[in-house]
Regions:
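Membrane-embedded segments
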Residues: 65, 70-140
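Alpha/beta-hydrolase fold nucleophile elbow
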Residues: 145-156
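Conserved alpha/beta-hydrolase "acid-adjacent" motif
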Residues: 239-245
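Short beta-strand/loop motif that positions the catalytic acidic residue
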Residues: 225-226, 231-234, 238
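An N-terminal hydrophobic leader/cap segment in hydrolases
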Residues: 11-63
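Catalytic active-site module of serine/aspartate enzymes centered on a nucleophile-bearing elbow/loop
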Residues: 274-304
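Catalytic histidine-centered segment of alpha/beta-hydrolase-like enzymes
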Residues: 265-276
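Hydrolase active-site cap/lid region
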Residues: 164-214, 220-223, 261
Length: 304
């Protein structure tokens, strides 16, 4: 009997040790993964595309209300309208968008998000504190001469951030967003579909940032943008964000709203798949809503 009890106790002790070891491993693994997410790779922008097309731009510094210096480029407008450009997670200033807008007379302001590129900042909050980055850019643009209207383009994380920002700041008059996510909670559920690791990752992220995951929810804020227009671009072969994100955001938004979704297009690849159509729709959208020039580049709502 004693041997049986001793054996049972040994088995129980071993099981507890194994469980403790697994828990510690998951905890350490989770901390490492969360730390990697909060510290994205830095890609320093070079401006090669802008120089190739002889686009005038100035290096400027923006300062957020929480004291973060952001490195940016600014091109003054020839038509009275400036477009803010917010890039995605781990990405850089989108020179391809900058070029197509600047060559059509738009002013452009593009910056490295906090903890990205040449900007200061220790961690990325994937949309939460990045709203302060947008506010710093918006304030800078509105303070420049010959600026009468401000619109915004965003990709991926930048798209989601701009939805949150535009819901707060009515000075953003028109919003074009490419591959946004509906909420950070949905995004993490999509990228980490594992019963134990998923809640652990969310818990650790909240500890590291002091931010509630559920507070980063563009789908709950997008309706506040109306009556200003929002244009949503969604590739239905997205593997970075849920491919139904665009439809959910469109359904949550109010008029005026537009959804452009295409089969077999990955995350933020619509331009590569349809470059002429993308450019035409982007310019037509801002021409109509910021300049009042309907049909200059065709109807942004139509195929073709």
């Amino acid at each position: 009997m004693k041997n049986k009890k001793s054996r049972a106790r040994s088995i129980l002790t071993f099981a507890v040790k194994v469980m403790a070891t697994v828990f510690i491993f998951l905890l350490l693994f989770g901390f490492a993964e969360v730390n990697n997410v909060l510290h994205p790779p830095r890609i320093i922008p070079e401006g090669k595309t802008l120089r190739k097309f002889d686009i005038e731009y100035h290096d400027v510094d923006l300062l957020t209300t929480d004291g973060i210096r952001l490195s940016a480029w600014y091109t003054p407008p020839h038509n009275g309208a400036v477009i803010l450009l917010a890039h995605g997670y781990g990405d850089k200033r989108p020179e391809w968008v900058y070029e197509m807008l600047a060559r059509k007379g738009y002013g452009v302001l593009a910056w490295d998000a906090r903890a990205h590129g040449a900007s200061d900042g220790e961690i990325s909050t994937i949309g939460y504190l990045e709203v302060l980055d947008v506010k710093a850019a918006l304030d800078y643009a509105l303070a420049q001469p010959n600026v009468e209207h401000v619109g915004a383009w965003g990709g991926s994380m930048g798209a989601s951030t701009l939805i949150l920002a535009a819901a707060q700041f009515p000075q953003i008059e028109a919003l074009f967003v490419d591959s946004p996510f509906t909420s950070l909670n949905d995004e993490l559920d999509f990228l980490i579909p594992y019963p134990v690791i998923n809640p652990l990752a969310k818990f650790l992220a909240e500890i590291e940032t002091g931010i509630r995951i559920h507070e980063i929810s563009p789908v709950d804020e997008i309706a506040r943008i109306s009556p200003r227009p929002v244009y949503i671009v969604q590739g239905l072969a997205d593997t970075v964000a849920p491919p139904d994100s665009g439809e959910k955001l469109f359904n949550a938004a109010r008029e005026p709203r537009t959804l452009w979704a295409e089969e077999n297009v990955p995350h933020q690849q619509m331009y590569l798949d349809n470059p002429r159509r993308y450019k035409r729709r982007l310019l037509a959208f801002f021409d109509e809503w910021l300049l009042g020039n309907y049909g200059t580049h065709g109807d942004f709502r139509q195929n073709g």
